[in-house]
């Protein structure tokens, strides 16, 4: 008798990348259902979000909207990993914010892959090519979910 366990799946969502590239209004409950198709067991559901503390201090609607969104993600079973926006000024005096969660997402996926059969990366960012290759080398099936502006190299991988 052959014992077949359910497929163990991990979902890693770059929320800002999806929102910027056609995924605004993403149905995270549907994403979970899609990832767990075929009776797959969700071992890890991570959502990487950016948060601007300066803006939240001045804009109650932004703050409350973000907190409500994070609460919704948690209700769907996602672990919310928050990256605070850091503000920089370039040599021309232009101010810009950055809250890049790519490294956190990559490290988490690689560390947790020991317990996964399939990894769903919800991002179109070409920086994840080596992560995809490393996960595949570890024996994981990797699926990419993205909408617009998907890296051509990532599509091929």
Predicted regions and their residues:
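Internal catalytic-core helix/loop-beta-alpha segment
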Residues: 82, 86-122
